Every structure is written in structure tokens, then in C-alpha cells.
A protein has these predicted regions:
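Active-site clefts of carbohydrate-active enzymes
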Residues: 219-223, 245-260
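Short beta-strand segments at enzyme active-site cores
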Residues: 24-25, 55-58, 90-96, 127-133, ...
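Active-site groove signature of glycoside hydrolases
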Residues: 84-105, 128-140
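A short, acidic, amphipathic alpha-helical segment used as a generic capping/interface helix at domain edges
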Residues: 227-241
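Acidic-and-aromatic substrate-binding clefts and catalytic sites of carbohydrate-active enzymes
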Residues: 1-8, 26-40, 62-73, 98-103, ...
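N-terminal pre-domain/capping segments
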Residues: 1-90, 106-116, 123, 159, ...
Length: 290
């Protein structure tokens, strides 16, 4: 994830020599005055020269509510959908939004009101919408940002937005932290996965067994791939076996150990770990003439 506001181009320029192959350009709630076509034009020479890509755009906020920031989030989604092709990508990711403080099911009428026009906008431009599976501290009964964090909610979501252009931005971390096994879940839902975040998790089984999930001590942590408990080789195999041709973009800045001065050490380790799990570098099959 390479969104850094007005410094995004400089940040991508710094990341390219580290070996990153793709970048998600992400925003929090608003575009912060950034003109997306101009940003796309700034990034294009860097991407072309390095053979890297923008995999997706992302807007994280709550487009279902009516506060000033929420309405800016909705406008940012419209602009991101319009601009995605200029970045050479066809995916815009983010949260569904949520009617704050209400159960998941109570958000569905408002979800349809807001998202059906956005889905139509995306369909007209050949763009896909991918909802991240992050609960943002919410539960089924209450929350502030997102309802697309659980398979029960996905069923409601996809029934409300019956378009092949609507899917998931999936990562194992958020499922592990809900005590869900990500491998069988991915097998079931892989056809709906449009984009993947490279983020892992670690469960403290002793804490879970002795203190449960509601104590003062956390029972799980977000980790960079390679430091967590996910079998990324299996995940990549499931994705490839289902025909997935998208990116896995590392979501950093969460690992409790590889942080601060170790942040990029952890992210580059995660990159190399994922590259090994996919089988390393691409190797052409030999061509033997008859």
C-alpha cells in the first residue's frame, strides 16, 4: 500500500528499488485535494521504467453516512472509479461503510441506496469494486466503518449488489483474528476475491486458552507475511488454481515487532517471503523444436 497523499509519487519512487512489483494507491476518507489524473501522469514514467504496476486504487471511509467526511468519501469513490483506468488498473477497493452503531443487517437498505449507483458507474467504465474484509473494531451488532468482514455479511452484501463487478479485497489476517481458518474460507470464496492484501496474523493460544478474547491482554496481533501463522504457499496455490491474476500488495505499518526503524526490514522480508511462496521468479519453459 503506497498511498502517501501528496508524497505518493516520491514514496513509490523510493519503494521501487526495494523490489516491490505492484502498488495499491490508497486514501483515508478523502483524496486530500489530489487530482487523480495528475497523479496517474506522475506515476506512469516510474511504472513504465521499472516494469511495476498500480494494482488498484483504494478509498477507506464510511460512504453510507451523511457527515461531511462521509460525503467526501462517497465523492472520492466516484473519482477513483472514473480515474482507475488512467492508472492502468480496473479495481477500486475500500470499506462498504456502515450505519453507525447498528447491526450489519440494518445497513443493507442504505448500502443499496449508495452502492447501486456506484456499481453502475463502475460497470460502465469496466471497473471492479472490492470490499475489504476488515471489521475495524466492529461486530455483527455494532460498528462504525464496514460490514464486509464476515461470510454471513458477504452473503447479504452480494445479494444486495448482484453484480459480477462486486467482490472482495481479502486477506487472511482479519479472518484469523476472528478465529476463522482462512484456507477453507478462501477455497469457498475465491471466485469473489479481486484483490489481496499481504498481511498476516499471530494468535497467542495460551492467552486465548487462559484469558479468552475479552481480557486486558490481546490474544492476536497483525503481522507481516513471513512472521505470522498463515500458509501463504497454500493461499497462492488456491488463488492461482482458481485463475486469480491479481496482485498481493503488502499492507505494512501493523507489525508490533517489525516497526519504527524495522518497518521496511519487515516489509521487504514479507515481499521476499511471498515471492518464495509463489515459486520464486517466473521461468520460461524450454522450447524444443520438433
Amino acid at each position: 500500500m503506497a498511498g502517501r497523499g501528496k508524497r505518493t509519487t516520491d514514496y513509490v519512487r523510493a519503494l521501487i528499488p526495494l523490489g516491490f512489483e505492484s502498488f495499491q494507491i490508497n486514501f483515508w476518507q478523502t483524496l486530500d485535494g489530489i487530482e487523480l489524473p495528475r497523479l496517474a501522469a506522475e506515476l506512469r514514467p516510474l511504472l513504465d521504467a521499472s516494469g511495476t504496476i498500480v494494482s488498484s486504487l483504494a478509498v477507506f471511509g464510511n460512504p453510507l453516512e451523511t457527515g461531511e467526511k462521509d460525503m467526501e468519501t462517497r465523492r472520492a469513490w466516484e473519482k477513483a472509479i472514473d480515474a482507475a483506468p488512467e492508472f492502468g488498473c480496473d479495481i477500486v477497493c475500500g470499506f462498504t461503510g456502515r450505519v453507525r452503531g447498528k447491526p450489519v443487517s440494518d445497513s443493507i437498505p442504505r448500502l443499496k441506496e449508495v452502492w447501486l449507483p456506484l456499481v453502475e458507474r463502475a460497470e460502465a467504465r469496466g471497473v471492479r469494486i472490492a470490499f475489504e474484509n476488515c471489521p475495524m473494531g466492529g461486530t455483527w451488532e455494532s460498528g462504525d466503518w464496514n460490514i464486509a468482514f464476515n461470510p454471513d455479511a458477504w452473503e447479504l452484501l452480494f445479494a444486495a449488489l448482484p453484480s459480477g463487478r462486486v467482490g472482495l479485497e481479502w486477506e487472511p489476517c482479519h479472518q484469523i483474528c476472528q478465529l476463522i481458518d482462512p484456507i477453507p474460507q478462501l477455497r469457498e470464496w475465491v471466485s469473489r476475491v479481486f484483490h489481496v492484501h499481504g498481511k498476516d496474523a499471530e494468535i497467542d493460544r495460551h492467552c486465548l486458552a487462559t484469558r479468552g478474547i475479552s481480557g486486558a491482554k490481546p490474544f492476536c496481533w497483525h503481522r507481516a507475511p513471513g512472521f505470522g501463522q498463515t500458509d501463504w504457499t497454500s493461499i497462492i496455490s488456491i488463488l492461482r488454481g482458481a485463475g486469480y491474476r491479481g496482485a498481493i500488495d503488502i499492507e505494512g505499518w501493523h507489525d508490533p515487532v517489525y516497526r519504527d526503524e524495522l518497518e521496511m526490514t519487515g516489509q521487504v522480508h514479507a515481499l521476499r517471503h511471498l515471492q518464495r511462496c509463489r515459486g520464486g521468479e517466473f521461468v520460461l519453459n524450454p522450447v524444443i523444436e520438433a
